[in-house]
């Protein structure tokens, strides 16, 4: 079991590392490539577009050909793309490299969740996904620090060489440590009754797609508007802003690492309801805030709400799928990436302020999710195939 957890964690961490590590070198990258920082900020969207593109096919391939081949190919693509970014001499080449890098990270991301679905039952999977969320929260804190230390002595290309090394390590883990976990039965050989229970259009799965997508949209909106809120509206300098973001990351980590213990005391539904109540409270606190302290409390509740509920919701979403876990993971990833991008784009088009953009998604997320949690209940455990057929 340890090998599956180690490989899954490594596969997932390529995604946030590819986002956070290069940001510290953005001014120098823009200078060397003859582009403005604003032009290169699109590299974030390009990276997410690459991830979404990979998710369109990676899950289906993983269900047909196995998790291990997709993990290996994804790691190789990430390595090649990181080298392309390091060798770029024009912004267009850099953006192409970032898109391909997103394809590699997206492939690995999908496979990681499929592996966890293959190897863990509902309760253990919810605990592991909560821990994984906590580990992922460490990356936004550590990656910029590591990037800064690297750039004290080396050029910005070294950031992508570091990512290359990470991709190589993930590839080696996938080749030598990871074992195939895809169930031996093929989806087309499943019985009609079994196949019906794994429909992507069943009401429970659709409800969890919406809940997780809204939750991801809320947390990404917070990340996107935090510089404007803290540095422009609250008057923080860069140092104070970094300290505040580190504090929020610590809240996320503390709650994520506590959630597995909470699952021993409370039901998953209780934790998911708590998550949405925290989102609602955060929205109300931000809308009523007249002091910085209340604003920071509201932002802290966003981090806590996401951390306590997201892993549990993802576990429930994947629960009904044994033979189609890869496709289900892909659908979840695509919905989350596209949904969050759509909201941020629409809010910018409408002209919402940073604070109103955040308050709007928090209120909408909490109300819609609370209704879904109260109305749409999980299928009976008997309908799940909790005994995963793991190939040795």
Curated annotation (Swiss-Prot):
What membrane topology does the annotation report for this chain? Multi-pass membrane protein
- Provide the alphabetized UniProt keywords: Cell inner membrane, Cell membrane, Membrane, Transmembrane, Transmembrane helix, Transport
Q: Name one GO molecular function term.
A: transmembrane transporter activity
- Provide one Gene Ontology cellular component: plasma membrane
Gene3D superfamilies attached to this UniProt entry: Multidrug resistance protein D
Location comes to:
Cell inner membrane
A Pfam match is MFS_1
Supply the InterPro entries for this chain.
MFS, MFS_dom, MFS_Efflux_Transporters, MFS_trans_sf, Multidrug-R_MdtL
**Chief localization class?**
membrane
The regions listed as transmembrane in this protein's record are 4-24, 38-58, 70-90, 95-115, 131-151, 158-178, 209-229, 246-266, 270-290, 294-314, 331-351, 357-377
Please give the PROSITE patterns that the UniProt record associates with this protein: MFS
Q: Which domain of life is it from?
A: Bacteria
The entry's protein name is Multidrug resistance protein MdtL
- The organism of origin for this protein: Klebsiella pneumoniae (strain 342)
């Amino acid at each position: 079991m340890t090998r599956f957890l180690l490989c899954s964690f490594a596969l997932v961490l390529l995604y946030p590392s590819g986002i956070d590590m290069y940001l510290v070198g953005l001014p120098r990258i823009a200078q060397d490539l003859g582009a403005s920082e604003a032009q290169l900020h699109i590299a974030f969207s390009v990276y997410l577009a690459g991830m979404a593109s990979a998710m369109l096919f990676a899950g289906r391939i993983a269900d047909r050909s196995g998790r291990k081949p997709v993990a290996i190919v994804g790691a190789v693509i990430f390595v090649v793309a990181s080298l392309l970014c390091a060798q770029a001499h024009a912004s267009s080449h850099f953006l192409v490299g970032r898109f391909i890098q997103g394809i590699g990270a997206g492939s690995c991301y999908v496979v990681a969740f499929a592996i966890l679905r293959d190897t863990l039952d509902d309760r253990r999977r919810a605990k592991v996904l909560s821990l994984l969320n906590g580990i992922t929260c460490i990356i936004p804190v550590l990656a910029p620090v590591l990037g800064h230390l690297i750039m004290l002595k080396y050029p910005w290309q070294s950031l992508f060489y570091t990512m290359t090394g990470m991709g190589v390590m993930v590839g080696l883990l996938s080749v030598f440590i990871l074992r195939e976990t895809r169930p031996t039965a093929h989806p087309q050989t499943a019985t009609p009754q079994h196949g019906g229970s794994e429909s992507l259009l069943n009401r429970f799965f659709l409800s969890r797609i919406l809940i997780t997508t809204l939750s991801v949209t809320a947390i990404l909106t917070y990340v996107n508007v935090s510089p404007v809120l803290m540095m422009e509206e609250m008057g923080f300098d860069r140092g104070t802003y970094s300290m505040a973001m580190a504090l929020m990351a610590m809240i996320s980590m503390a709650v994520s690492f506590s959630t597995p213990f909470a699952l021993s005391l409370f039901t998953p539904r209780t934790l998911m309801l708590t998550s949405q109540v925290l989102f609602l409270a955060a929205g109300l606190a931000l809308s009523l805030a007249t002091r910085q302290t209340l604003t920071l409390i509201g932002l802290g509740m966003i981090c806590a709400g996401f951390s306590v509920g997201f892993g549990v919701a993802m576990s429930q979403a994947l629960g009904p799928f044994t033979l189609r876990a890869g496709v289900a993971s892909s659908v979840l990833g695509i919905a989350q990436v596209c949904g969050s991008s759509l909201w941020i784009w629409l809010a910018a088009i409408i002209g919402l302020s940073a604070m109103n953009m955040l308050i709007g998604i928090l209120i909408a997320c909490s109300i819609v999710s609370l209704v879904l949690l109260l109305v749409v209940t999980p299928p009976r455990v008997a309908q799940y195939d909790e005994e995963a057929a793991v190939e040795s």
